[in-house]
Structures are given as C-alpha cells and as structure tokens.
Amino acid sequence: MIKVEKLSKSFGKHEVLKNISTTIAEGEVVAVIGPSGSGKSTFLRCLNLLEKPNGGTITIKDTEITKPKTNTLKVRENIGMVFQHFHLFPHKTVLENIMYAPVNVKKESKQAAQEKAEDLLRKVGLFEKRNDYPNRLSGGQKQRVAIARALAMNPDIMLFDEPTSALDPEMVKEVLQVMKELVETGMTMVIVTHEMGFAKEVADRVLFMDQGMIVEDGNPKEFFMSPKSKRAQDFLEKIL
C-alpha cells in the first residue's frame, strides 16, 4: 500500500528526516510515536505531499507520488488527513464542511454529498449538530467533524497528526472511540499520537522515531514491554 524508501527532508540546514524507509500494508494501523522534534509530523505530511521531500521516494498503490510532475491534488483525494487543530471552515456549517470537498473536488451532486455527509455524522454521533457552525462545537466535536470530513472523500488511507493533543482530557475519549470504530472497518491508518494506551490497543505496528530516524519498528506489545533501544527505553520511562 505505502512504500517509503530513503526519505529525506530538510528545512534550511536542519535535516528533519534522514533516509527513512518503511512499508505499510493495506489495512494496517501504524502508530508513529517519539519525542517532540523527532520528525513524526513531517514524515506524516510527506505521505500526502503537504511537505515535499528533498530525497527518496514514496509509492502508494504502485504509483510513485514523489515524481516531479505528480498531481498532488489527485494524490490527496485518496488520502484523508486529520490535523491537530481541526482546520474546519468557520463560515460553513458542519454539514457544509463535510460536503465541500466531495462537491467541489470530486464533483459529486449536492444531494449525494449531503446524504453521505449525514450518514457520516450519524456514525460519529453528531447528526443533530449538522446545521451548527464550528464555533458552537466543543473541541472533541470539531475533531469528530474533521474525521467525518476526511472520510467523505472515500480515502484509501487515513493520516492522523496528533488528533487529540489540542483537546481537553475529557474530550479525548470520544475522538479515540471514533478512531477505534474506523480501525474495525479495515482502513489503512497512520497515526502520530501521544496516546500510548490507544497505540498499544489498536496499532498493528509502532514506529518509534528520534532525531529524524525510525529507531524501532515493531509489534506494540513487544515495544511497550521491552523496547530494544536505550532511547526508546528512556522515552517510555518518562511518559508511562
């Protein structure tokens, strides 16, 4: 599904990703964890070309998306992205937020887009909020709308960039529940997260990153019970 080979990314002279290579299978759920500044979010943003790599290749479903003339908008149609700070349109209702990309990018009819949006809102438990504007929603509700909006494009892959880190603690659970339900559908998911219990419970694999490199790549149970690297041991001791 996703093949990353020797991926590198720099901002000025600062090398953020250093020759990263990994493969993610279809239907696999991969949690990306590590200390702040380790390159986790940059790695995720490279997967849908929100950041353009300086070197290496990314291949998704046999298509190398890092080729110079790649249509980035086409790539993003098939990859849903959920951000830390929601990125909802403040001047559009919940329903309009979810319908926007299917109507304007995929050219779906408004009726079809609305039916799909309403169905997704039922799934994330927010159908009754469909005509509200984002400023009327809690942080957890905004993030659930953001997940529904990403799913409205029928993506093959979902990327989550610390989806709960901007939320009050009591709102984290409702967002994680929606994500758990998505895992059960067999969606391919890459999740940058600080929620270690969630990573342990739902991930098929854990990538531990530090200083722009993947230091460990393995089974969540083994990683959390007995990390191999000193850096991972130190990290887990501080947060668990």
UniProtKB/Swiss-Prot annotation:
GO terms for cellular component: plasma membrane. Disruption phenotype: Impaired growth on arginine as the nitrogen source. It is found in: Cell membrane. Keywords: ATP-binding, Cell membrane, Membrane, Nucleotide-binding, Transport. The keyword Manganese does not apply. It is a peripheral membrane protein. One of its GO terms (molecular function) is ATP hydrolysis activity. Belongs to the ABC transporter superfamily. Residues 2-236 form the ABC transporter domain. This is Arginine transport ATP-binding protein ArtM. ATP binds at residues 34-41. Its main location: membrane. Part of a binding-protein-dependent transport system for arginine. Probably responsible for energy coupling to the transport system. InterPro entries: AAA+_ATPase, ABC_ATPase_HisP-typ, ABC_transporter-like_ATP-bd, ABC_transporter-like_CS, MetN_ABC_transporter-like, P-loop_NTPase. It comes from the Bacteria.
